Amino acid sequence: PGVSTSATLRVGNTALTGQVRGVGQQYFQVKGVRLAEGQAFNAEAVTRYAQEVVIDPNTRQKLFGSGNALGEVILVNNLPVRVIGVTEEQKSVFGNSETLNLWIPYTTAMGRLLGRDYLNSITVRISDSVSTQAAETALVKLMTQRHGTRDFFVMNSDSIRQTVESTTATMTLLVSMIAVI
């Protein structure tokens, strides 16, 4: 489960804008995000709308400098949250981002920060032994049964990969044709 919003982050006299993601306790495992310090929140934290936060190294640097962030409180808009973990640096194909990233339990984000009762996204990771097409079909069927209509869309990483490969092949052919001319 996931929701996201941008918010003002305040520590002392420092106020910055950051990206807050409300996620489930399995988010870090599913996305392969590792912690450099502290811990991620657990199922109990999600159930009790805990005011706990995991931050990225960029957020730690901007808000706490070289000091220890664990146990410190960040005001996210007007919601105080205690830092329980700091992620490892995330490598991106697009370079390092200046975005300040924070993760809180999705229940906390929905109930205490956003005041709403619906999700933006659900991320599913399937076993290598399961067909992505079969998993997608089963998920669409389940969601349609639950919603009564198909009022959602599904993104499959295999479909994205195939599109990128097809585009790359087309561009290679185009460049080869230009070279021939």
Model region roles, listed by residue range:
Residues 1-40, 154:
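Short amphipathic beta-strand/extended segments in non-transmembrane regions
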Residues 3-6, 46, 123, 157-160:
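Short linear capping/connector segments at secondary-structure termini
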Residues 6, 17, 126-130, 161:
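Short histidine/acidic/glycine/proline-rich micro-motifs that form metal-
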Residues 7-11, 91-95, 161-165:
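A short acidic, helix-capping loop that chelates divalent metal ions and anchors anionic groups
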Residues 8, 71-75, 153:
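Residue-level detector of beta-strand face positions
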Residues 17, 49, 128, 173-176:
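Alpha-helical transmembrane segments of multi-pass membrane transport proteins
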Residues 21, 25-41, 49-148:
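Mid-to-C-terminal secondary-structure elements
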Residues 138-139, 145-179:
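Peri-transmembrane interface segments
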